[in-house]
Design a protein with these regions (language model features):
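Conserved catalytic cores of phosphodiester-cleaving nucleases, focusing on short active-site segments
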Residues: 17, 21, 43-62, 81
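Acidic-residue sensor for enzyme active/binding pockets
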Residues: 14, 40, 55, 109
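Glycine-rich, flexible loop/turn motifs
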Residues: 30, 69, 132, 136
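Catalytic cores of nucleic-acid endonucleases
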Residues: 58-114
């Protein structure tokens, strides 16, 4: 089995989150890794009347349980997500999939199991079924404070 570094784990965590959101939650993924200046949004999706901006946090199960991945989304990061989301809406307000939609920010925590259960065969690709997902809908207010 292949070892992965933090960047690769994060990339695969985002892939797992996209898979989860589309297959399990019915979201339509319209973009990923959107940048506005130095601010990034991991996933942009549609969920009914909402355009959803998603922050993905991926951690290994071996880390302390009290350190939930979502806790890594601090106030400054939340403000950056909001600024990037506002920029995306401003740049795309004339598109049908944005016009008239309400917006919200979700956080998806992906907790990865021990190495021996992570991957499909020897492909190095993380399996959705092997991960624990915690989906926090509407995770914080537009001023960055937690709900």
């Amino acid at each position: 089995m292949k070892n992965v570094n933090n960047r690769e784990l994060g990339r695969q965590g985002e892939r797992i989150a996209r898979e989860y959101l589309s297959e399990k939650c019915g979201y339509t993924i319209i973009g990923s890794n959107y940048y506005a200046s130095h601010k990034e949004i991991d996933i942009i999706a549609l969920d009914g009347e909402y355009i959803v901006f998603v922050e993905v946090k991926c951690r290994t199960k071996t880390e302390r349980p009290s350190h939930r991945p979502g806790r890594a989304v601090g106030f400054a990061k939340r403000k950056n997500i909001i600024e990037a989301a506002n920029r995306f809406i401003f740049e795309n307000c004339d598109l049908d999939f944005v016009a008239g939609k309400r917006s919200r920010v979700d956080v998806v925590e992906v907790v990865v199991p021990p190495m021996d259960h992570r991957f499909n065969d020897n492909s190095g690709e993380l399996k959705l079924s092997a991960c624990s997902i915690n989906h926090i809908r509407n995770a914080f207010y537009s001023d960055g404070t937690l709900r």
